[in-house]
Curated annotation (Swiss-Prot):
Entry note: cofactor: Binds 1 lipoyl cofactor covalently.
Annotated InterPro entries: 2-oxoA_DH_lipoyl-BS, Biotin_lipoyl, GCV_H, GCV_H/Fam206, GCV_H_sub, Single_hybrid_motif
Cofactor: (R)-lipoate
PANTHER family: GLYCINE CLEAVAGE SYSTEM H PROTEIN, GLYCINE CLEAVAGE SYSTEM H PROTEIN-RELATED
Highest classification ranks of the organism: Bacteria, Pseudomonadati, Pseudomonadota, Gammaproteobacteria, Enterobacterales
Function: The glycine cleavage system catalyzes the degradation of glycine. The H protein shuttles the methylamine group of glycine from the P protein to the T protein.
Source organism of the structure: Sodalis glossinidius (strain morsitans)
UniProtKB keywords: Lipoyl
GO cellular component, one term: cytosol
Record carries keyword Protein biosynthesis: no
Any single Pfam family the record assigns to this protein: GCV_H
Modified residues (N6-lipoyllysine): K65
Record text on subunit structure and interactions: The glycine cleavage system is composed of four proteins: P, T, L and H.
Name under which the protein is recorded: Glycine cleavage system H protein
Length: 131
């Protein structure tokens, strides 16, 4: 059973979102997603300063099994990326909710976060997938 921290918000496409304050949100992929993908070999992250709309593909996770698009959970501008993943993409596997974060985005509209799934709704969605 995947770990689904309650303090985070989630997307149906397995991204997590952490409110860091001042309209900045940290984004990564969930433990469930990294379990499905397997061992990460490369992370293609967005450029700092790039802007994305919610649901737009903005990064790629390459694992031993597949390359998978990562989607912007909310609209905004990329303000930071996790440079540690260049040398150590496996952090996405070993610490998906901490050291394996992908990027930080400054929201265009904070209210979009309210449309994301809470932990219970995300857990229900992955339970349904597993059936």
């Amino acid at each position: 059973m995947s770990n689904v921290p309650t303090e985070l918000k989630y997307t149906a496409s397995h991204e997590w979102v952490l409110n860091e304050g001042d309209g900045v949100y940290c984004v990564g992929i969930t433990e469930h997603a990294q379990e499905l993908l397997g061992d990460m070999v490369f992370m293609d992250l967005p450029e700092v300063g790039a802007t994305f709309s919610a649901g737009e593909d903005c990064a790629v996770a390459e694992s031993v099994k597949a390359a998978s698009d990562i989607y912007a959970p909310i609209s905004g501008e990329i303000v930071a990326v996790n440079d540690d993943l260049e040398a150590s993409p496996e952090l996405v596997n070993s610490a998906p909710y901490t050291d394996g974060w992908l990027f930080k985005i400054k929201a265009t509209d904070d209210s979009e976060v309210n449309e994301l799934l809470d932990a219970a709704a995300y857990q229900a969605a992955i339970d349904e997938e597993d059936e």
